[in-house]
Amino acid sequence: MLRTTPHYIDPRTNRPLTDPNYVMECAIESVRNKIDDYDSVLVITQIQPFIDRFVQEFGSKCIFTDRQRLKTDADWKGGRSDAHYKMTDKEYELEYQNVLLDVLLASKTDHILGSTSNMFMGALIMNPNITFGSIEKLSDFGGA
Protein backbone atom coordinates (compact mmCIF):
# COMPACT_ATOMS: atom_id res chain seq x y z
CA MET A 1 0.00 0.00 0.00
CA LEU A 2 1.76 3.09 -1.27
CA ARG A 3 0.69 6.64 -0.45
CA THR A 4 1.60 9.98 -1.95
CA THR A 5 5.07 11.36 -1.32
CA PRO A 6 4.16 14.14 1.18
CA HIS A 7 2.81 11.54 3.65
CA TYR A 8 6.37 10.34 4.31
CA ILE A 9 8.75 12.27 6.56
CA ASP A 10 12.43 12.72 5.68
CA PRO A 11 14.33 11.65 8.83
CA ARG A 12 17.16 14.07 7.98
CA THR A 13 14.96 17.17 7.87
CA ASN A 14 11.85 16.04 9.76
CA ARG A 15 9.83 17.51 6.87
CA PRO A 16 7.61 15.82 4.29
CA LEU A 17 9.42 14.19 1.39
CA THR A 18 9.14 15.83 -2.02
CA ASP A 19 10.72 13.27 -4.36
CA PRO A 20 8.25 10.64 -5.63
CA ASN A 21 11.10 8.69 -7.25
CA TYR A 22 12.71 8.21 -3.82
CA VAL A 23 9.40 6.94 -2.42
CA MET A 24 8.98 4.50 -5.34
CA GLU A 25 12.53 3.19 -5.03
CA CYS A 26 12.17 2.67 -1.26
CA ALA A 27 8.96 0.70 -1.84
CA ILE A 28 10.55 -1.35 -4.61
CA GLU A 29 13.57 -2.12 -2.43
CA SER A 30 11.28 -3.33 0.37
CA VAL A 31 9.33 -5.55 -2.02
CA ARG A 32 12.54 -6.82 -3.61
CA ASN A 33 13.71 -7.90 -0.14
CA LYS A 34 10.53 -9.96 0.35
CA ILE A 35 9.41 -11.05 -3.14
CA ASP A 36 11.27 -14.38 -3.08
CA ASP A 37 8.93 -15.52 -0.30
CA TYR A 38 5.80 -14.81 -2.39
CA ASP A 39 4.36 -15.59 -5.82
CA SER A 40 3.27 -12.04 -6.64
CA VAL A 41 2.89 -8.50 -5.39
CA LEU A 42 -0.48 -6.75 -5.15
CA VAL A 43 0.21 -3.07 -5.78
CA ILE A 44 -2.30 -0.81 -4.08
CA THR A 45 -1.99 2.84 -5.00
CA GLN A 46 -3.99 5.48 -6.82
CA ILE A 47 -0.88 6.80 -8.60
CA GLN A 48 -0.27 5.42 -12.10
CA PRO A 49 3.50 6.18 -12.25
CA PHE A 50 3.94 4.01 -9.13
CA ILE A 51 2.12 1.13 -10.86
CA ASP A 52 4.21 1.62 -14.00
CA ARG A 53 7.47 1.50 -12.03
CA PHE A 54 6.44 -1.67 -10.19
CA VAL A 55 5.53 -3.38 -13.47
CA GLN A 56 8.88 -2.29 -14.92
CA GLU A 57 10.67 -3.87 -11.95
CA PHE A 58 8.58 -6.98 -11.23
CA GLY A 59 6.76 -7.61 -14.52
CA SER A 60 4.13 -10.33 -14.47
CA LYS A 61 4.48 -10.76 -10.69
CA CYS A 62 2.52 -7.49 -10.29
CA ILE A 63 -1.19 -7.63 -9.64
CA PHE A 64 -3.33 -4.50 -9.55
CA THR A 65 -6.90 -3.53 -10.28
CA ASP A 66 -7.68 -2.29 -13.76
CA ARG A 67 -8.96 1.25 -13.30
CA GLN A 68 -8.12 4.83 -14.05
CA ARG A 69 -5.49 6.24 -11.71
CA LEU A 70 -3.99 9.65 -11.10
CA LYS A 71 -1.25 10.62 -13.54
CA THR A 72 0.75 12.46 -10.89
CA ASP A 73 1.78 11.96 -7.28
CA ALA A 74 -1.46 13.48 -5.98
CA ASP A 75 -3.35 12.72 -2.81
CA TRP A 76 -6.70 12.15 -4.48
CA LYS A 77 -8.82 13.79 -7.14
CA GLY A 78 -10.48 16.80 -5.54
CA GLY A 79 -8.43 16.32 -2.37
CA ARG A 80 -5.76 18.39 -0.70
CA SER A 81 -3.55 18.59 -3.76
CA ASP A 82 -6.40 19.58 -6.10
CA ALA A 83 -8.80 21.56 -3.90
CA HIS A 84 -10.17 23.56 -6.83
CA TYR A 85 -11.62 20.45 -8.46
CA LYS A 86 -15.09 19.50 -7.28
CA MET A 87 -15.89 15.80 -7.51
CA THR A 88 -19.32 14.71 -8.70
CA ASP A 89 -21.43 12.29 -6.69
CA LYS A 90 -20.59 9.57 -9.25
CA GLU A 91 -16.85 10.25 -8.85
CA TYR A 92 -17.15 10.03 -5.05
CA GLU A 93 -19.08 6.77 -5.36
CA LEU A 94 -16.42 5.28 -7.65
CA GLU A 95 -13.64 6.49 -5.32
CA TYR A 96 -15.31 4.78 -2.35
CA GLN A 97 -15.81 1.57 -4.33
CA ASN A 98 -12.13 1.55 -5.33
CA VAL A 99 -11.02 2.16 -1.75
CA LEU A 100 -13.16 -0.67 -0.41
CA LEU A 101 -11.96 -3.03 -3.13
CA ASP A 102 -8.33 -2.20 -2.34
CA VAL A 103 -8.83 -2.78 1.39
CA LEU A 104 -10.65 -6.08 0.81
CA LEU A 105 -7.99 -7.32 -1.59
CA ALA A 106 -5.16 -6.28 0.75
CA SER A 107 -6.82 -8.09 3.65
CA LYS A 108 -6.72 -11.34 1.65
CA THR A 109 -2.96 -11.24 0.99
CA ASP A 110 -0.31 -13.13 2.94
CA HIS A 111 1.67 -10.02 3.92
CA ILE A 112 1.21 -6.24 3.67
CA LEU A 113 3.95 -3.67 3.26
CA GLY A 114 2.66 -0.17 3.82
CA SER A 115 2.57 2.87 6.01
CA THR A 116 0.11 4.57 8.25
CA SER A 117 -3.25 4.98 6.56
CA ASN A 118 -6.85 4.23 7.31
CA MET A 119 -6.82 1.72 4.45
CA PHE A 120 -3.75 -0.07 5.86
CA MET A 121 -5.38 -0.26 9.29
CA GLY A 122 -8.68 -1.39 7.75
CA ALA A 123 -6.99 -4.31 5.99
CA LEU A 124 -5.29 -5.35 9.24
CA ILE A 125 -8.56 -5.15 11.16
CA MET A 126 -10.32 -7.26 8.53
CA ASN A 127 -7.62 -9.91 8.83
CA PRO A 128 -5.89 -9.76 12.23
CA ASN A 129 -3.77 -12.81 11.30
CA ILE A 130 -2.02 -11.14 8.38
CA THR A 131 1.66 -10.32 8.74
CA PHE A 132 2.71 -6.78 7.94
CA GLY A 133 5.58 -4.35 7.98
CA SER A 134 6.56 -0.81 7.11
CA ILE A 135 8.13 0.11 3.82
CA GLU A 136 11.81 0.31 4.72
CA LYS A 137 13.21 3.85 4.81
CA LEU A 138 9.64 5.18 4.85
CA SER A 139 8.75 4.25 8.40
CA ASP A 140 8.39 7.91 9.44
CA PHE A 141 5.14 9.29 8.16
CA GLY A 142 2.47 11.87 8.75
CA GLY A 143 -1.27 11.61 8.34
CA ALA A 144 -3.68 8.75 8.77
What residues fall within each predicted segment?
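General secondary-structure edge motif
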Residues: 34, 85-86, 103-104
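Generic structural signal for short, solvent-exposed loop/turn connectors between secondary structure elements
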Residues: 34-39, 116, 141-144
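A signal for specific C-terminal beta-sheet/loop modules enriched in small/flexible residues
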Residues: 61-84, 127-144
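Residue-level detector of alpha-helix boundaries and kinks
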Residues: 39, 90-94, 108-109
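Surface-exposed acidic, glycine/proline-enriched linker/cap segments
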Residues: 79-98
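A donor-sugar binding/catalytic signature common to diverse glycosyltransferases
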Residues: 97-142
